[in-house]
Amino acid sequence: MKGIPTIKGLGRHSAMGGQLRQEHDSMGCVEVPAEALWGAQTQRSCNNFAIGNQLIPAELIHALARIKGCCAEINGRHELLTAQQVQAIERAAAAISEGTHDNQFPLSVWQTGSGTQTNMNVNEVISNLAARDTGHALGSHNPVHPNDHVNRSQSTNDAFPAAIHVAAVLLLQNDLLPELDRLIASLDEKAGSWMDIIKIGRTHLQDAVPLRLGDEVSAWRDQIHQGREWL
């Protein structure tokens, strides 16, 4: 994760243009950028919570999309979704989890509690991707409705914390552990090459017994290795 992305930095609205379409949900009608894949609830959040410019991290969006795909598969097994709906959700969720549609998630980290709006942002983008891929209009909720189908059998209070865990594990596996391995290898190499260098140890502000610089560096290496194993 390279810090929390910003709206300005990603230019998430720059490609949307000035044309609008109308999206409808249980709360009524709202205007959305014509080419945007998000829907009414996401747009309301953009309108009502224009606070700061830090966006929800893409890694969390990708993890939440993975969960949507898995939920669709299970719902299909229990005949709560048709095979067509499962396939449409899984295809869209996979594309999102790969980062293909990162510019369709404009919400700030400053929003109402529990992540409900981000959950709906993912639901709406999946719904509209499915609509577009099957030749239906954006906002038609055909073949999958963002709430009734994409979010079926889920609660934000479960899905969002689960996505946090998934994102943390993926970042750990893909980013942190490989970097720690490189650091451990580098310290191991330095420990070996610096065994002939003698330095004075320190006890607080006083000189202590002599020791090899390689021994000191090997202690750093072992501490990092132990921390890696705990992770």
Spans of model-derived segments:
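Conserved, well-structured ligand/cofactor-binding cores
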Residues: 2-231
